[in-house]
């Protein structure tokens, strides 16, 4: 048996409060350790501000910021998969490479979605 004991799980609002701080720690870790996360967040903030200026109504604004949030979420998942794979060992393994590559591909698809939505929207504004 190890010296480390898992504390009993909190319930109710205390659990939600603890979860909020775990999430804050995760965001802080991603911001400090992952340059790709910082780049995605800065681009997302820029696009959210731009969408607030360009969108004609709430629905249009929501559709413009959707790919921004999606890419931030996918980058968090991508980074967590990379951290978990790196934690399991330092040796190269083909399955570890596949896991990292698939997580990266998910982010690529999110960024393509972002580009398609914004590209189509800005093109329509330009051609008006």
UniProtKB/Swiss-Prot annotation:
Locations listed in the record: Cell inner membrane
In this record, what's one Pfam family?
DAGK_prokar
* Active site per the UniProt annotation: 75
User: According to the UniProt entry, what is the EC number of this protein?
Assistant: 2.7.1.107
Any one of the GO BP annotations: phosphatidic acid biosynthetic process
Keyword set includes Signal: no
Q: Name one GO molecular function term.
A: metal ion binding
Q: Which UniProt keywords apply?
A: ATP-binding, Cell inner membrane, Cell membrane, Kinase, Lipid biosynthesis, Lipid metabolism, Magnesium, Membrane, Metal-binding, Nucleotide-binding, Phospholipid biosynthesis, Phospholipid metabolism, Transferase, Transmembrane, Transmembrane helix
Q: Which reaction does it catalyse?
A: a 1,2-diacyl-sn-glycerol + ATP = a 1,2-diacyl-sn-glycero-3-phosphate + ADP + H(+)
The secretion signal range is: none
Residue numbers binding a divalent metal cation: 34, 82
Broad EC category: transferase
User: Quick one: where is this thing mainly located?
Assistant: membrane
Cofactor names from the entry are:
Mg(2+)
What does the record say about its membrane topology?
Multi-pass membrane protein
The free-text function statement in the UniProt record for this protein reads: Catalyzes the ATP-dependent phosphorylation of sn-l,2-diacylglycerol (DAG) to phosphatidic acid. Involved in the recycling of diacylglycerol produced as a by-product during membrane-derived oligosaccharide (MDO) biosynthesis.
Which PANTHER family has this protein been placed in?
A: DIACYLGLYCEROL KINASE
Q: Which family does it belong to?
A: Belongs to the bacterial diacylglycerol kinase family.
Under which name does UniProt file this protein?
Diacylglycerol kinase
- Source species, please? Helicobacter pylori (strain ATCC 700392 / 26695) (Campylobacter pylori)
Phylogenetic classification of the source organism: Bacteria, Pseudomonadati, Campylobacterota, Epsilonproteobacteria, Campylobacterales
Gene name tied to this protein: dgkA
């Amino acid at each position: 048996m190890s010296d480390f004991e898992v504390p009993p799980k909190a319930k109710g609002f205390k659990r939600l409060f603890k979860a909020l701080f775990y999430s804050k720690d995760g965001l802080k870790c991603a911001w400090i350790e992952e340059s790709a996360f910082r780049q995605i967040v800065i681009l997302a903030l820029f696009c959210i501000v731009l969408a607030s200026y360009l969108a004609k109504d709430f629905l249009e604004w929501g559709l413009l910021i959707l790919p921004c949030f999606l890419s931030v979420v996918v980058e968090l998942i991508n980074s967590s998969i990379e951290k978990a794979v790196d934690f399991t060992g330092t040796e190269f393994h083909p399955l570890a490479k596949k896991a990292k590559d698939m997580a990266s591909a998910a982010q690529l698809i999110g960024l393509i979605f972002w580009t398609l939505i914004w590209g189509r929207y800005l093109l329509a504004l330009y051609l008006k």
